[in-house]
Structure formats: C-alpha cells, structure tokens
Amino acid sequence: MNAAASLFSADNPGLPALGLVQLWLHLGWGTLLAWLGVRMGTRLGLQPRAAWVLASALMVWAWLPGPYAPVHWLGLAFQGPSVMAVLLCAVDLVWRRTGSGRFREGPSFWSGAWLAAGVLLGWALLLDTLALLPVSLYAWGFNAAVPALLVLLALLPWVLQGGSARQHSMSVLVVAVFAVYVALHLPTGNVWDALLDPWLWLYLNARAVRAGFAGRRGVLP
C-alpha cells in the first residue's frame, strides 16, 4: 500500500519555467492557428499559396504583444495547448507543405484504439474534475513514474505489430510528447495536460461520433 502510494505520489512536481510557459503560449497557439488557417483556406477553396499566406499571417498575429494577439485571450481562457495538439498540427502542416500526405495513425485496429484512448482519458479526467472518481487521477499526472508507464503503453502497438516508424506514427508522436514533457514539463507540469486539452478532446469526440456513423476508422485530418 505504501509502495503504491509512493509510486503515484504527486509530491514535489516538476513545473515549467515561467519564461517557457510564455514562449509555449505563443508557439503552441500560433501553430494551432496556422493549422486552422490552412484548413479553413482549403475548405473555402483558396489556392494553396493563399491558404499558406493566411496560415503565416495567423502565426505572425499570434506573436504580437499583449492584448493585440489572440494568444493573450486564449491563454487567459484556456492556458497553453497540449503538447500533443501542437505536435499533431505541426506534423500535419509539414506533411501538407511537403506533399508527404496526411498524418496516419497506423493499422485500423490501433487507429480505433488511439482514438478511444483519447476520448476515454478525457472523460475520466472530466469525472475526476467533478470528484466522481474514487482516486485523484489528475494528481497522478504530476508523478514522474507515470510518463514512463505511458511510454511503454504507447510503444505496445509497435512491439506487437512491427513495421516502420511511419506505420506507427502515433506511437512515435506520443513518445515525442513525453520527451518534450520530461525535458521541459510543458505546458503545466502535469502529464495529462501534455497529452490532452479540452479542444483536442472535443475534436476526438467529434471524430469518434463521425467514425461511428460512417462505420469505419480513419486518419486524423
């Protein structure tokens, strides 16, 4: 009992430096806004060059000082985005720009498993916020042992299925998220905040609903 309590203890959490938090607000939200710019431009039928100009303008706007930038208000309302959301958007932007295709989750079973894991984690954290769980799940996210356990779980699809890193992009991406978190403790010092944020969770729920109606599991757009 004492060993288990020690394993998941949240004493002495590693918190990010204040300067890094401010930098992450601009970099993180700027990346998400740029991704939204490309997506909106594509949906509106803009030429690729025009869509990328829109994305670049949104990224520059995110770096304006004080209340002139959307980051100021987004940070007040939502703090910084998750490392997962930022890396997903950044990878998708790079692949769209280079013509390498869209970000793929791997074999269909694991695509569904990753999607379900994100949705269920969000619901569990919501229940924890409402004090409806017998344990404090969010507090576990401050413990240094939890990321190591989650890395092992993230590599499980790759170990069981084999194949290249490209075939298991999500496993690689999740490990990258943990690497950023362990090195910098972004965005809040809690590993759950590095993996998931409210906007990403809502997006995953929408994807799950759409996949359910379509009767298939797909790729992250």
Predicted feature locations:
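Hydrophobic cores of alpha-helical transmembrane segments in multi-pass inner/ER membrane proteins
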Residues: 24-37, 80-98, 147-159, 199-215
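Central hydrophobic cores of alpha-helical transmembrane segments
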Residues: 51-59, 168-182
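Short, charged juxtamembrane terminal tails flanking transmembrane helices
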Residues: 216-221
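Juxtamembrane "helix-exit" motif on the non-cytosolic side of transmembrane helices
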Residues: 63-71, 126-136, 182-189
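Membrane-proximal helix-loop-helix units in multi-pass membrane proteins
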Residues: 82-161
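N-terminal topogenic module of multi-pass integral membrane proteins
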Residues: 1-82
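Non-cytosolic membrane-interface motifs at loop->transmembrane helix junctions
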Residues: 71-79, 105-107, 136-145, 190-200
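Membrane-helix boundary connector in multi-pass membrane proteins
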Residues: 159-172, 181-194
